[in-house]
Regions:
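Compositional signal for N-terminal targeting/processing segments
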Residues: 1-281
Length: 281
């Protein structure tokens, strides 16, 4: 039973997550298998949906979906998505390349990302997906250090969300506020067509989305003009920086998924396996 704390209106349940955590990705899958939902809403812009879902179909091969800022339309450092090739290293995306100063927004298609796990599960169960974040010509991130996600093994998601709630502060700048209002408006629109909606969003944003949803004066800000999204292969040397978990741990999660084995405690057990594997080499 989902706690009232995580309900936004009569038809929306929110699952606040810490991005890049295998433990939160596991919690997303558990919740979606336990409760029937007729719609999944995620905090990503609609322009990312097609490329992201195509990339998810190719997991466990990781990739990245990129949207260049409008300020950098003249940049030529990326190839188009139709040149995506596993053997073509010339078109690999290397975020550690210091020779380029490109402004981009990107989504790492990483199975240990809670949002990716939610979309992947919804695709497998044929649940409609809606990307409800506002389109931005240059995304302004909002982040901070959060408590260790391993706490989920000792407490419920509801208790975790309640424990961090007093320390969650609103973002700065007009864009963050506009994004919150836009997502709240989209949830209102979805509530007309769906009765059991699951919203997967950052633990930093959900209290403000809930407040905006219940604001009678809520208005929907207009999206900004954008560039088309593109999808790229990732160079092996940068997986450590792209993936939320260590590449070795991510591989263990994918192997457990394929073998239908228990992966609840892989965040800790995987480190043990990593040390054993390193000792044997």
């Amino acid at each position: 039973m989902i706690d009232k704390l995580l309900e936004i209106g009569p038809h929306v349940t929110v699952l606040p997550i810490v991005h890049g955590s295998g433990d939160f990705a596991w919690e997303v899958r558990r919740l979606m298998m336990k409760h029937p939902y007729d719609c999944l809403a995620v905090a990503l812009p609609p322009s990312f949906q097609s490329a992201t879902e195509e990339a998810i179909l190719e997991l466990p091969t990781p990739s990245i979906v990129v949207q260049r800022d409008l300020q950098y339309l003249t940049a030529t450092d990326f190839s188009s998505s139709n040149e995506f090739s596993e053997d073509d290293n010339a078109h690999n995306f290397n975020p550690s390349d210091e020779d380029h100063e490109l402004g981009v927004s990107y989504v790492p298609v990483d199975p240990c990302q809670g949002v990716i796990a939610a979309i992947r599960t919804a695709m497998g169960d044929r649940i409609p997906r809606r990307f409800i974040d506002m389109e931005t010509s240059r995304f302004e991130p909002h982040s901070r250090v959060m408590p260790d996600a391993f706490a989920l093994k000792k407490m419920s998601l509801e208790k975790y969300a309640a424990a961090v709630l007093p320390f969650v502060e609103p973002g700065e700048g007009a864009q963050w506020k506009a994004r919150i209002q836009h997502m709240a408006w989209q949830l209102r629109e979805l509530s007309v067509d769906f009765k059991k909606i699951l919203l997967v969003t950052s633990v930093l944003d959900w209290p403000w989305i809930r407040a905006a949803f219940n604001d009678k004066a809520l208005d929907c800000p207009d999206s900004e003009p954008i560039q088309e999204t593109e999808r790229f292969q990732v160079t092996a040397g940068t997986l450590y920086f792209l993936l939320g978990e260590l590449p070795f741990i991510t591989n263990l999660y994918e192997r457990a998924r394929e073998e239908l084995s228990d992966d609840e405690h892989l965040g800790i057990d995987g480190v043990k396996e990593l040390l054993i594997a390193a000792r044997e080499r």
